[in-house]
Amino acid sequence: MEIKGFSFSAVEAGIRYQDRLDLGLIYSDHPVVAAGALTTSLVKAAPVLIDIDRLEDGCAQAILVNSGCANACTGEAGMEVAFVTGELLAKELEIKPENILLSSTGVIGEPLNVRAFRDNISPLVQGLAPDNFEKVAQAIMTTDTVQKVCYHSVEIDGVDVHFMGMAKGAGMIMPNMATMLSFVITDAQIGSAQLKEALTPAVKKTFNRITVDGDTSTNDMVLVMANGGAQNSSIKSGTQAAEDFQGALQYVLMDLALKIVADGEGASKMITIRVCGAREDAEAEQVARTVANSSLVKTAFFGEDANWGRILAAMGRAGVPFDPYQVDISFGDVTLVRDGLAVGRSAEDTATAILKEKEITVCIDLKSGKCCEEVYTCDFSIDYVKINADYRS
Amino acid sequence: MEIKGFSFSAVEAGIRYQDRLDLGLIYSDHPVVAAGALTTSLVKAAPVLIDIDRLEDGCAQAILVNSGCANACTGEAGMEVAFVTGELLAKELEIKPENILLSSTGVIGEPLNVRAFRDNISPLVQGLAPDNFEKVAQAIMTTDTVQKVCYHSVEIDGVDVHFMGMAKGAGMIMPNMATMLSFVITDAQIGSAQLKEALTPAVKKTFNRITVDGDTSTNDMVLVMANGGAQNSSIKSGTQAAEDFQGALQYVLMDLALKIVADGEGASKMITIRVCGAREDAEAEQVARTVANSSLVKTAFFGEDANWGRILAAMGRAGVPFDPYQVDISFGDVTLVRDGLAVGRSAEDTATAILKEKEITVCIDLKSGKCCEEVYTCDFSIDYVKINADYRS
């Protein structure tokens, strides 16, 4: 897929490692509507701080992104360097620096290699082409094992609207407002307020529902740019068109979010924790999140052990009131626990077979209300520890 | 050490595995003062529910404990079986069942093997001897690799008072009121209200400050029995004697708590996270606990990587306000981060050498107040995953 007006480029800039794409550019041939959802961590990387400011006018023309260095915990010097990288690009593209969004991912606390930018901005801009989207998706990978992109189109008000999304992230993933990095472009015609209105709930239901290891990054961000090329009548709040747009955006973000979970560091399985029968959505989410973050639950999944006791134990510390002897738990369509008690050995044997699959849904019914939420996670493997004991070396 | 009036026994009852001590008994030759701190998990094992009730009168004569089965999530049947085990023991000892405290540890959700109790209560009672304390400490081990005991004596009001403590626990350890299991006996003369008064703050500063994996067990408990044999004048609240007693009890609990962390599942290092300069104790604790529970921080310690960026990132999601650019972080006596910024490569190299040690203290100074708290944890290793992927098989 291509979207007219957008072009992309990526180069091997040697920011931290040689011989890999590590500097990417998303460019629109004119300033377009933009919105973002950025990390809620108190410790925010320099590019996050800059983007919060630059997104205020709801307008952007380019996203400059690097892997290899997060430019986080780098103080005034880190801010200064980030500004310099933007200015280098602005000069090369002959656009305003304020319309460039910056994004970094990689090791925290090390200075950004500004020389790598200086030497490579020119070839980066020269490489811009409408079919280079996936090269950028590759350039933003760190411990990811696969590139993560999503192409989607939907009819809004009788007009075809297109979306192209990418994401990266495999560890330090329990986004709170955004994942590590995700960029989506669309040709929808939409105002910046309406774009923000669509983005916030879409992020809440997608990136904010995944967890690999319970850690929230300093650099998390989702950025969306909409250039209006589809020429639909501009989307107004509260209309069917707004609902369709939000649905399509959420589809793209969910696809990317699940790709992140499936590629979680060391993950061998994707696990959906669905909590139903809660009194409130927030309680359902809290229970699901506590289970999804339990190291004991996640190692049991890795061991393909239908250890529902660990699930109930995790639920018990979630801080949400429920009656343990009303709880049902099933793996796929096999009920393991009914009214808080084991159904029996043969159900466990069937569940153990289900655990050999790559995608598993755990349903927890609290039977005390009508609210339901899902959280998406992966198992906790030996490779997770290997990857993270080793990441910087 | 022995304490007159107390005797101990343990047998191989075959509750889950053969050829290992798995049933233990702590017995006092008369009913004595007792207090407990039990799990705050909403999901409470049968013995926990029974003990909460039986501790109300502040009096007990025996503790019956088994490993191999937690008797948690077992409903009415589990309660019934627990009562039966107590009655079997009461009959054999010719004491009141209400004076027997019950304790179980092991797999959740499986029925307790009552026959193993029936067949072994008699040899268990026959084996009672004043020097069998460590046999009970062995009988309560599950994934523990070493028995954990602590002997301590202290002068209170001019009289020598003795303490004998044991604990077990290696995984599912983020106690909230208690660790998995810990039993302490003492010959102090003290009322039940005063004993409870001493126990609560002592648990708060010790077992409630350790975390192996962020999971709180359904079976956590600390039980203390005091038989008055030291013949000190009974300890009154608010006196020097009360302070001395509380200090001694806290010493014993801290010793046992740190032994649990050092023997954390798969642990290769013990790590103290000390947060200073906080505005409130609770904020210091919250920051320390968030860092101590971060999988990324813990895997970095396993990898002996002085990755302070992960520490700052974890702090950023702790929900506690602080200025990242005021934070100092040191490993041992090496300052790695000053005012939120890296001190430099040579400090990191020195810190990396410190990480090769078995016990490491991380000091985090928020520089925004005068409050300090410590949380104790261990690293997150490949073996943790192996142990927990494999525990039930």
From Swiss-Prot, chains A, B:
GO molecular function: glutamate N-acetyltransferase activity; L-glutamate N-acetyltransferase activity
Reactions accelerated catalytically: N(2)-acetyl-L-ornithine + L-glutamate = N-acetyl-L-glutamate + L-ornithine; L-glutamate + acetyl-CoA = N-acetyl-L-glutamate + CoA + H(+)
Lineage, broadest ranks: Bacteria, Pseudomonadati, Thermodesulfobacteriota, Desulfobulbia, Desulfobulbales
Annotated GO CC locations: cytoplasm
Function per UniProt: Catalyzes two activities which are involved in the cyclic version of arginine biosynthesis: the synthesis of N-acetylglutamate from glutamate and acetyl-CoA as the acetyl donor, and of ornithine by transacetylation between N(2)-acetylornithine and glutamate.
Positions that bind substrate: 142, 168, 179, 265, 388, 393
Protein's name according to its UniProt entry: Arginine biosynthesis bifunctional protein ArgJ
Alphabetical list of PANTHER family matching this protein: ARGININE BIOSYNTHESIS BIFUNCTIONAL PROTEIN ARGJ (PTHR23100), ARGININE BIOSYNTHESIS BIFUNCTIONAL PROTEIN ARGJ, MITOCHONDRIAL (PTHR23100:SF0)
Subcellular location: Cytoplasm
EC category name: transferase
Gene Ontology BP term (one): L-arginine biosynthetic process
UniProt keyword annotations, A-Z: Acyltransferase, Amino-acid biosynthesis, Arginine biosynthesis, Autocatalytic cleavage, Cytoplasm, Multifunctional enzyme, Transferase
Organism: Desulfotalea psychrophila (strain LSv54 / DSM 12343)
Subunit and interaction comment: Heterotetramer of two alpha and two beta chains.
UniProt EC number: 2.3.1.35, 2.3.1.1
